[in-house]
């Protein structure tokens, strides 16, 4: 065997090993992404099933949200905290959906209409707070998520799962 032949074989082997490493790396990244999405989905489901989240949902659906930042600040501390906590939960959920870390289908199937109803209650206060703080980014992902859920419910409402069987 000549040195040229050996060099060609070595170069081919090197190229093949680089291709194999690249394919392996791509597969690993896809697997890690899928695992992360699955983990976040399960975590979101667990969060929706906590007593704390149930209390937040119950409060928000049963009470009016103050229309202004000032009226929100005058609420008893525990009520203001509940209103803030629920908005933070919805904001976090919106971020997870916007960044495609969890699928909007999960939100639609679990608390979809709640997001829209809650945003309807929060909207006036949040818009007031955005102007007065000023913080134009306040609850932007909560608003975005509620708008996406509304669009889905209007344009392509899903059928209840039990009707599919």
Give short role names for the model-derived ranges.
Residues 3-6, 42, 76-83, 108, ...:
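Amphipathic, non-membrane alpha-helical segments in soluble helical-bundle scaffolds
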Residues 42, 68-69, 126-130:
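Charged, low-complexity surface segments at secondary-structure and domain boundaries
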Residues 2-5, 9, 13, 80, ...:
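N-proximal short alpha-helices
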Residues 2-67:
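Membrane-proximal alpha-helical anchors
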Residues 63-93:
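A contiguous binding-surface segment within folded domains or other stable secondary-structure elements
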Residues 82, 87, 92-165:
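An amphipathic alpha-helical interaction surface
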Residues 45-74, 136-151, 159-163:
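Long amphipathic alpha-helical segments that form oligomerization/scaffold cores
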Residues 11, 24, 72-75, 86, ...:
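Generic signal for short, ordered secondary-structure residues
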């Amino acid at each position: 065997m000549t040195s040229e032949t050996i060099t060609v074989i070595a170069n081919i082997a090197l190229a093949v090993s680089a291709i194999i490493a690249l394919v392996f790396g791509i597969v690993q990244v896809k697997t890690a992404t899928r695992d992360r999405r699955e983990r976040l989905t399960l975590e979101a489901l667990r969060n929706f099933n906590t007593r704390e989240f149930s209390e937040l949902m119950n409060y928000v659906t049963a009470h009016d949200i103050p229309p202004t930042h000032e009226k929100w600040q005058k609420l008893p501390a525990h009520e203001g905290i509940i209103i803030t906590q629920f908005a933070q939960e919805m904001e976090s959920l919106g971020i997870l959906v916007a960044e495609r870390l969890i699928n909007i289908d999960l939100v639609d199937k679990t608390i979809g209409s709640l997001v829209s109803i809650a945003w309807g209650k929060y909207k006036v206060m949040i818009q007031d707070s955005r102007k007065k703080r000023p913080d134009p980014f306040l609850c932007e992902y909560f608003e975005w998520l509620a708008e996406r859920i509304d669009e889905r419910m209007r344009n392509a409402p899903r059928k209840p799962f039990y009707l599919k069987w």
